[in-house]
């Protein structure tokens, strides 16, 4: 099958279209013909080798972390899906590879595609949708009337997280560039800060939750926004010892993560704030919840551009510019 493959770790020039064998099908697996996949920041982080300590992949590797497509075949223990079903998913960490014509996915990681979305729109949802759900619903337990600050409101996670937080009844603040202010307000944000003109920590106070998708440099400023008892939740690091425990990482690696996260954990603790690192995981059941919200009109995916599979490298480069509004899609079929 045709796929976008990396043979070594490196920056933008790494990766090419080539041939790989079709995936094996285990008893509880579903073989999906991929129609569309989406680009995530995680793809570039995997390609560069930035996360190889916590996600040790064997090369050559097919990149790609979410998709939408059609069921081709199911394993003998699969009961929820049958050939012809239109589905979407974020595969498990150790079984990525959606920039390809086929993928084998665990039944429990898969969900039926929202009926009101195209394949391209559906492919834009799984990773960012699950990230927003696991941060806001699972970890933050966001309630109506609470205040949440979502960094980078026009990005892939931001566009979904704003809509989910509004559905949950929260007051939502976010940041974006000058040209996107009105557009992000239209997604539902109550307060939009133009980061080119204002510093968020000078404007925002007494927030319950901050969702940070940016670098470590904004984490300390984010602490100033939160009230005592608030939660600073980062999806971009630094990872914590708790995360190492969940991932089953080695003792030495756990100590490394303890060191790299020590500074922000200590500063948060001094302010009575809880710091959590969230690395989203695959979940078909949560995707079904998200699908219901999409079908009800509470969440609308945002697609910026669509590239053909042969232009996957260009799609990755475009996302790397930071200019995409919402998600960038790779059309496979």
Listing of model-derived features with the role each one plays in the protein:
Residues 126-197:
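Mid-domain Rossmann-like dinucleotide-binding core that forms the NAD(H)/NADP(H) cofactor-binding site
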Residues 68-92:
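A glycine-/small-residue-rich N-terminal strand-loop-strand element
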Residues 201-209:
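A short acidic, Gly/Pro-enriched loop at the edge of an enzyme's catalytic core
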Residues 11, 20-68:
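N-terminal glycine-rich beta->alpha transition that marks the start or flank
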Residues 218-296, 332-333:
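Glycine-rich phosphate-binding loop and adjacent beta-alpha segment
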Residues 35-36, 74-76, 92-93, 153, ...:
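Short, surface-exposed secondary-structure boundary micro-motifs
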Residues 279-333:
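C-terminal hydrophobic helical "lid"/dimerization subdomain
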């Amino acid at each position: 099958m045709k796929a976008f493959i990396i043979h070594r770790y490196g920056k933008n020039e790494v990766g090419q279209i080539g041939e790989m064998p079709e995936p094996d099908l285990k008893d509880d697996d579903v073989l999906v013909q991929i129609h569309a996949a989406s680009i995530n920041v995680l793809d570039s982080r995997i390609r560069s080798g930035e996360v190889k300590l916590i996600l040790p992949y064997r090369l050559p590797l097919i990149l790609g972390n979410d998709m939408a497509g059609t069921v081709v075949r199911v394993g003998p223990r699969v009961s929820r899906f049958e050939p012809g079903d239109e589905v979407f998913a974020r595969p498990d960490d150790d079984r990525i590879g959606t920039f390809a014509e086929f993928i084998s996915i665990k039944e429990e990681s898969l969900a039926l595609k929202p009926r009101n979305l195209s394949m391209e729109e559906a492919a834009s949802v799984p990773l960012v949708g699950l990230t927003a759900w696991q941060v806001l619903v699972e970890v933050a337990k966001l309630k109506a009337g609470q205040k949440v600050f979502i960094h980078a409101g026009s990005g892939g996670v931001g566009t979904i997280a704003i809509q989910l937080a509004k559905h949950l009844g929260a007051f939502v603040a976010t940041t974006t560039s000058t040209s996107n202010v009105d557009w992000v307000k239209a997604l539902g944000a109550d307060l939009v800060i133009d980061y080119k003109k204002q510093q968020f920590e000078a404007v925002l106070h007494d927030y319950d939750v901050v969702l940070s998708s940016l670098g470590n440099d904004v984490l300390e400023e984010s602490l100033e926004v939160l009230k005592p008892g608030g939660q600073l939740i980062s999806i971009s690091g630094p990872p914590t010892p708790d995360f190492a425990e969940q991932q089953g990482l080695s003792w030495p690696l756990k100590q490394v993560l303890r060191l790299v996260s020590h500074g922000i954990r200590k500063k948060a603790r001094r302010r009575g704030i809880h710091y959590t690192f969230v690395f989203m995981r695959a979940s078909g059941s949560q995707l079904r919840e998200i699908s219901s919200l999409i079908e009800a009109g509470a969440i609308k995916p945002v697609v910026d551009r669509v590239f053909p599979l042969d232009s996957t490298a260009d799609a990755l480069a475009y996302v790397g510019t930071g200019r995409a509004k919402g998600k960038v899609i790779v059309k496979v079929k």
